[in-house]
Amino acid sequence: MKRPIDFEDAIREALADSVTAYCKPLPKDFELPCVLITQVGGRTDYTWAGVGEIDAADVTIDSRAETDAEAVETLRNAIGYLEEAVSSQTTPLLMMELNTFSSTINDPVRPDLKLCTARILTRARREEI
């Protein structure tokens, strides 16, 4: 059987050596600065000839830090490291595309922290189990 990969975990693993990254839910004792990876949508895309079944996922990456500058820097680094991992083909992810990058706001959960969000589109082959 083939099934979609766990996009959140694949992204977290790709970032593990460079950025403190969590999949939802964010733990109560999270480290700063960090990113939270959340899949917010997805679909199956059968159009890639020669590659097989491909899934696409819309994912948000939320960066949390003590300052605006640190939140932005952490998010920029996470995106850069993820692009590197995708292009080096060391993850199940085949591609990623940055769709939006927000300005910083106060974190609604922890107003003492700054939050910056990016939305990306990723694609990956289905995993066989």
Predicted regions and their residues:
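Acidic-leaning, charged glycine-interspersed low-complexity segments
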Residues: 82-129
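Short, solvent-exposed beta-strand/turn "edge" segments of beta-rich domains on protein surfaces
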Residues: 48-54, 108-111
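Low-complexity, flexible helical/coil segments
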Residues: 57-59, 69-77, 96-100
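Small/polar-rich, solvent-exposed N-terminal microdomains that initiate assembly or binding
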Residues: 1-51, 73, 85-94
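Mid-chain, well-packed structural core segment of small domains
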Residues: 65-87
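Intrinsically disordered, low-complexity acidic/polar segments
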Residues: 46, 70, 127-129
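Oligomerization/assembly interface segments of phage tail-like spikes and tubes
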Residues: 53-71, 113-125
